[in-house]
Each structure stands twice: as C-alpha cells, then as structure tokens.
Design a protein with these regions (language model features):
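Hydrophobic anchor at the beta1->P-loop junction of P-loop NTPases
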Residues: 5
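Conserved lysine of the Walker
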Residues: 13
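Hydrophobic positions on the alpha1 helix immediately C-terminal to the Walker A/P-loop
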Residues: 16, 20
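ATP-dependent small-molecule kinase phosphotransfer cores
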Residues: 23, 27, 31-90, 103-104, ...
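Glycine-rich phosphate-binding loops of nucleotide-dependent enzymes
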Residues: 98
Length: 124
C-alpha cells in the first residue's frame, strides 16, 4: 500500500509520516529529500542559487518521474511518500492531507529557525 501525505507548510507532514513508518514498518520517502539530492548531484549546492535557475524544472521532472515509477512498480509495497504532489502522480494511493492553523504554523516556523522573524511575521 502506498500512502501519500501532503498538507500545508509546517503542518507536521514529515513528523507524522516518519512516526507512522516507524510504528507500522513502512518505507519513508520524502520528495523534498529526493529533490535536494538530485540538485546536489547536478552541481547545485546552494538552494537559493538553484531556485533562481531554470534547471529547477529539470530536477522537478526527475523527481516527478521517480514518483510515477514508484507508483507503477512498487504499488504492493508498504510506502509512505511525504510530498506536495505524489497523490496526483499515484492516483491509487491512500491520500492524507494535514491541515494546520496559520498561527501554529508560524510558531513552528519560528521555533525551527527556518526564516528571518520579520519575514515570517509579515506573512501573518
């Protein structure tokens, strides 16, 4: 069974996915990790520089194709995919969407030190 987990930023997608996988012995796949690994393999060590480059579309396509391949060839395996769009590429997956209150998401983002506080507060 393939489970695709998506949701709003800072909703806990990764945390929930990893906890589920550990408890039920599923394989964990994160498309964000796949994307970063492929970007690094293609010479993009600085993600900010990479985001400004047109090659982002090529890496996106590689990740999408890997997810499609998993959906076609590994459908009987126990896998959780933490991804924004895997549900779209694997229509037969069990789909989970995790929601989060905007204030909770902002607090999590601040606590994780992912961004400048002023940038986050302007988002709220």
């Amino acid at each position: 069974m393939i489970i695709t987990i998506t949701g709003k930023p800072c909703s806990g997608k990764g945390t929930v996915s990893k906890m589920f996988c550990q408890k039920y012995n599923f394989e964990y796949i994160c498309t964000g990790d796949m994307f970063r690994a492929l970007a690094k393999e293609n010479g993009f060590d600085n993600i900010l520089t990479f985001q400004l480059n047109e090659d982002i579309k090529k890496i996106d396509a590689l990740v999408d194709n890997q997810i499609i391949d998993i959906g076609k060839n590994r459908i009987s395996e126990n896998i959780v995919i933490d991804s924004r769009l895997a549900w779209h590429f694997i229509p037969q997956s069990f789909k989970v969407f995790i929601d989060v209150d905007l204030n909770v998401a902002a607090k999590r983002l601040l606590e994780a030190n992912r961004e400048n506080e002023n940038t986050i507060l302007s988002f709220i």
